[in-house]
Amino acid sequence: MQTRLGEKDINLPQYYNNRELSWLDFNYRVLQESYDKNNPLLEKLNFISIFSSNLDEFFMVRVAGLKDQVKMGYDKPENKAQMTPQEQLDAIKIKNTDYVNTQYQRYNELIKELANYDIEMVKPEDLSDALIEKLEQEFKLSVLPTLTPLGIDAYHPFPKLNNKSLNIFVDIDTEDAINSAIVQIPSLIPRFLTLNEGTKQYVVMVEDVITYFINYLFTGYEVLNTFTFRITRNADLTIHEDGAEDLLIEIERFLKERKSGSAVRLELDCRTSEKENVEWLINQLEIEDNDIYYLDGPLDLTFLFGLVDHLSHKLKYLTYEKYTPQPPRSLGNKNIYQLSLERDIFFHHPYESFEPIVDFIRQAADDPNTIAIKQTLYRVSKDSPIINSLKEAAENGKQVTVLVELKARFDEENNVHWARMLEDAGCHVIYGMTHLKTHSKIALVVKRINNELTSFVHLGTGNYNDKTAKLYTDMGIITTNKDIAEDAINFFNYLSGYSTKPEYNKLIVAPYDIRDVFIDRIDKEIRSHLQHGNGKIMMKMNSLTDKTIIEKLFEASQAGVKIQLIIRGICCLKPGIPGISENIEVVSIVGRLLEHSRIYYFHNNSEAHIYLSSADVMTRNMIKRVEILFPVEDKSIGQRLVNYMNLQLSDNQKGRYQDAQGLYHYVENNSSPLNSQSYLMQEAIKYGEELKKQSVQPSGQPVHSRRGGSWMRKLKNTFKR
């Protein structure tokens, strides 16, 4: 039965973007940053690398899942754009081929620009005899000992090649016959070698070096042909939770299995001419034409991360000017625990430092008045100071409970390591919940103050990861609100498995309630608008895929409610369609920092309801994850959030608006340039400088652009709260 609002059928596929194609469009917006004239050269190369890294995961998970559906004969269309799995795979191939070709065209342009700074990407045959001699020495010393040719014949079947591995196919004349072999390039050796001559530095890809000196591996035989190829495998395998006696052991089994999943993509150099060998390889990998990509340059451009890191020491002026996160405006120089007894404290990372959150746990671990610490961990850094503090707290006799989500994709191995280490230190470790991923960001510290127990709660939109907190925009609040403290205690009891679904005072928790609360809030906004004529909804998130909420937003738009959506990534809703979504606008901001915070605002006739959350409006977040949506009740913090969203909606440098056809366009620059991320960095720096000069919290007037302009005047005082 189709849902109808008014006379419009909102199930028509033309009102929706397909999830996978929308993600590819997001990844293209990442690639667009390599064209931005305001980005330094090395940062442009970084965006090309990010594009490739993103695409690897997309193929390992999303494409792999679609291919599995096709193999099982599943041909039911998805519920929004109504495309079957095979139709999606065909469309992905067309769109992604275009985007990848654009990526390599841009890569080759930027590599030519590098030559202006005496950095040249070359093949070994382009080097002088003296440099080839040096290269040969380096090859024999650092590369050759790591290589093992894998013969392919009756006694040597086709080898199990690792996921994302780079390999060289070799044909050898052994006199008796022409045989083949594969040389897998170890992932732990450098991807490129560098050679200096005068003022120039030459960069040579390791696969080109191995190919040039390939005879060292096949002494006595003639090498006839070689070509390089790369395999991507299915990493979207099933973790069997139901029958697992020990989830830790099951995860470790799963990690081994993932390395050799079925092949989902084969990448080849477009100059590869060995058609017969390529056909043989395709048959061995059991892939189809749709899975093959011919590339005009080195395979796997994620090597640019390492190249940029290598060159940034010499060419620092070709990177972003360093930014140091500043003291939080809500905290200033005050003690985090003392101040939180008086009022809620707001944090906006990475404009404001993540260090106070690290200190929040560190101080609790050291304080003899601390009774208990409870925390959820989804993704943490490899040398996490928070992990160290939790271990120290347990060793100091505190009651420490940590939920480590073992099923956090591509962080499983890291999380297994931390779970074992925390257990060894005496922490009570929860591995997660059956069939659910715990994606919530919450920490609870219980202290004895004046012979009474006081609970301090941190709630956030992003991970407790001190490394990504410098790159991802996220928000958090520390509060001693008694209702939220009680909710936090009940939440952790629920996670531990010793409680049925609690009744919460203020926290809203998925998989049970977040979707229902969103529906209720949208319905109330519709009623308020029909009565007062001022309905407005603003939402900021990473992705929007949940059809139930999209339909409700269509209904609100049809009722006249103004809806502004700031969605960095996937957006399955098409805005601006007359009679359906004409009152909805969608903007995506992709820039220096990765937009990661989730904010939900409902005007409610000037009695606004504002929430922060760990959850995007995706079906998986609504029904397959443990998420927290929490209210922002402090008026000054709420105003900061509203001002922040208005600022982002006014961004005419990094903002792209989606049209009714689902296409994204840069905002037309009809006013003074405004980059919301740069603006907030300037604001934070100014506050940090003022804080050094005075002990009282300053007013935090905005930094004026050198270009001035109306927007800078309008935004004066916007972020002073």
Curated annotation (Swiss-Prot):
Its EC number is 2.7.4.1. It is an enzyme of class 2 (transferase). Residues 434-468 form the PLD phosphodiesterase domain. One of its GO terms (molecular function) is ATP binding. Keywords: ATP-binding, Kinase, Magnesium, Metal-binding, Nucleotide-binding, Phosphoprotein, Transferase. One of its GO terms (biological process) is polyphosphate biosynthetic process. HAMAP family: Polyphosphate_kinase. Belongs to the polyphosphate kinase 1 (PPK1) family. This is Polyphosphate kinase. The gene is ppk.
